[in-house]
Amino acid sequence: MDKHRRDESPSGLSDIVEHDGLLGTGLTTRHIEAFGRKVTSTAGHLIGPTGDGNPAHYHNAMADIQRELRRPNTQRRVFALTQTTPTDLVRSKLSTSEIQSRALSSLPDDLLANIPDDSSSYSLFEGFQASQDDIEYRKAHRRRASKSKKLLKDGENRAALPSAPAELKKERDLLSRRMELMGVRKNMCSSEIHDIDNKIANLHNMRKIVLDRLAGLEMEEAELEHELTELENKLEDIQEETPETAVVGTPKSSANDESMASEDPAMDASFMSESIYQKIPSPKSLKHKSKRKRSMPILHEHFSPGSLIKEMEAHTDMVTAIDFDYPFGTMITAALDDTVRVWDLNVGRCTGFLEGHNASVRCLQIEDNIVATGSMDASVKLWDLSRARSRPRSSRINKHEDEEDAADDASQVSHSTTLEDCHVFSLDSHVGEVTALHFRGDNLISGSADKTLRQWDLVKGRCVQTLDVLWAAAQADTLNGDSTWRPSGRVPDASADFVGALQCFDAALACGTADGMVRLWDLRSGQVHRSLVGHTGPVTCLQFDDVHLVTGSMDRSIRIWDLRMGSIYDAFAYDKPVTSMKFDAKRIVAAAGESVVKVYDKADGNHWDCGAGVGADEQGPLPATVDRVCLKDGFLVEGRQDGIVGAWTC
């Protein structure tokens, strides 16, 4: 047996290695010998040429390496090393602490210099541990808690319970650690909230700066547009005066022409008539210069709803009518101080007065540069602001000199001037005060206390149709089978206007009266097409669009009607009578006897207040009651009983 074993070594081992390879790798002794020869030749090549100049220990070291590589154990270790990855090699040679130390020591100085200084008492690693997901821990903890929280019955053996203080301490330490992690997480969340608050504050400051810049741009834009409009008007005036100058200018006549003129007196009379005719001013034309708006203001769109834009001390008495053409455009106000004022909303300044009525103006409307005013003197006047010229005001209607001076001092008006040459004509067919009017295109409809509605042709300046409200209502009841006219609702209030509000569109006319009825008229036939019954008090305001008609009444309610069905679509009420109402695409605003404007959102149905009375101290003086409102494109203007006018975003 021993001899047989001795025979196997080394020739037997070499045969096995020759046949099977080393360690099952497929490498034979031939490969090993070839590798050894290559190492020897390489070492000899490196050391041989410079052997004379190098120390002798280099040669001895290379000889030792060659002898070591020829040993089978060394060869097996070398070939095993060739099959090992670098990661496994590092893991097998280095400990965890050494790996961390080498990783930190290998960082470049630039990265180490850019590490931010943090005053937090928690390290980055603690924050990372605190932000790790703990689902698995919760599951395991829940299972342990469910086992440990079972109720003990009286008959159970308490001695069988494991009393292991080590486990309890371990659980306590674990919970304490989790409490620390919760504290770290809370502080991290608090820091994030502070950072977000700082960012929001910075964004608000940036937004305010941009809003101020936008306001300045719109101011400059308005000034440029005003200058451009003045230049265009001057060019048009020059073009109109040029042909007149050509007609008036006559060539120099010769001596023969003079003798012929002296011989023919009829010709001389004709010449004098023509000369006088040229000096007679031509009647005012109804054609007016269109006021083209080249750009629309957008500043109010970036304010939060309910923000104050401007507040003006417009009048010294209660505002009775108010209207404007577009946001930051031209506003017209009328009050019981017998004045009608024109305002530039862009700067909040009064640009002049419209004088001509003999009493207070109850209703008005502005469309482009045309203004219509209805007064208690039973007249309707039409004004063209594009032809206005300013002059110092001389007097006011029904005011003494002392009262005029006091009123001028109390009113904050920059330019006390009267706008001349803007009056077009007067419509004087009514015999009672004009309480409502509306015009569109060349048609104007006016309602009066004489219980009539009149349709006016603005081109010719004359009345083309008179509608008797009582007679038309009686005729409508007769057609429905009732021979007598009876007002629906309560008896008309003596203090209410008989015609409270009206609006026209082409041949359609909606009119609200003191009997609480809303009548829809057909101007082509002059008949009532439909009557809307629902209000129990005088109708004070109305407005309609393509689908709905909204009405406000002294019965404290606002009703929204479906024009297609003739039925009530929605309704809501306030604590006091509704005196004025307007709506746009998003909201309905109303004046309901309070110091605020009542706002109703169409989309979500919410009610909220807007105006100077919002947030006012109940112990201090409250702002005056809002009596008139006007809303266009989210721009709200309200007039109060003390004469103050405020502009708000809505």
UniProtKB/Swiss-Prot annotation:
Keywords: Coiled coil, Membrane, Mitochondrion, Mitochondrion outer membrane, Repeat, WD repeat. It is found in: Mitochondrion outer membrane. It is a peripheral membrane protein. Residues 207-247 form a coiled coil. It holds the Pfam family WD40. InterPro entries: G-protein_beta_WD-40_rep, WD40/YVTN_repeat-like_dom_sf, WD40_repeat_CS, WD40_repeat_dom_sf, WD40_rpt. Residues 241-261, 393-413 are annotated as: Disordered. One of its GO terms (cellular component) is transferase complex. Belongs to the WD repeat MDV1/CAF4 family. Involved in mitochondrial fission. Acts as an adapter protein required to form mitochondrial fission complexes. Formation of these complexes is required to promote constriction and fission of the mitochondrial compartment at a late step in mitochondrial division. This is Mitochondrial division protein 1.
